């Protein structure tokens, strides 16, 4: 399988569903890795990496309840949010997509984007 995408981008604490510009198809192999630090805007807390507040589970007010708050998460235009953290490798499968493509979006698992600082540097590779 050849690499069809190898892209670096920045996801800030302010970004809400940042469009990566990447189209993903059924059967694509996706590798996402992230580094960097954000401060979520919660007083008396420190910065965190893309894994978010490990040991905590986000409440229903966050985009991905149950995942670590303030972690890096993603979604496809046709689906639900999924946890990425510092890295994710998987084959994309969607039974209803057929031969078409869907767009990849990234964000922080935060209900109040814009009240903190910092960013994650993300590398996305897609093999087809």
Where are these regions (language model features)?
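Gly-Asp-aromatic-enriched flexible segments
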Residues: 1-128
